[in-house]
């Protein structure tokens, strides 16, 4: 059982929904980013999605693209991202970390080496947005063999014919992208999301978490009420981009997690 599996079992026993936060590793710099990540569990975050900075982030909207650029400008690399996770694990051995990014930096490092290093750093799962299920032998299956969850995205355009393929080797949870488009580009609506989540849950026993387009405590609560949890990324990253102090960002995160947990 991974930390992700354990976390969902714990939340289920408590009758609570999950709150997942996305932050870009190294934004705006390593030390500030580490301080923020260390503070997330105390702000009610159940699972941390740690963005891996990349030069060509095709699924990311402007807010997260800028965050990635700030991180890269500050010298952030795949190795430094792993270092950040390692530092976090010195004080927190229970909060799951999912690394989210693109395949190129992983491929460049070498899959076997990357998986060994990620496992050693305390990474629990991977979301690699540009690797479709047809490429499962590249990274998904080796990741599972290494004891990491491999989490897939399902979208409004994932029809019933495609869905079984997407779910086939997914573990940990399913990440449902609530809108078609890039991150931070529109608002998620519970009335649209609810039936889609139900459709996915009819095909899998995995928890279904919803992200993209969630930017207020009210929205976090509304979306979590029709799913197993909510993910917030751009709204949090935008606060970092605006230069808000870590304590202020964490206070904002707490309002979002309270929203999801009250669902």
Curated annotation (Swiss-Prot):
Keywords: Amino-acid biosynthesis, Aromatic amino acid biosynthesis, Lyase, Tryptophan biosynthesis. GO terms for molecular function: tryptophan synthase activity. Pathway: Amino-acid biosynthesis; L-tryptophan biosynthesis; L-tryptophan from chorismate: step 5/5. The active site is at residues 49, 60. It catalyses: (1S,2R)-1-C-(indol-3-yl)glycerol 3-phosphate + L-serine = D-glyceraldehyde 3-phosphate + L-tryptophan + H2O. The keyword Oxidoreductase does not apply. Tetramer of two alpha and two beta chains. This is Tryptophan synthase alpha chain.
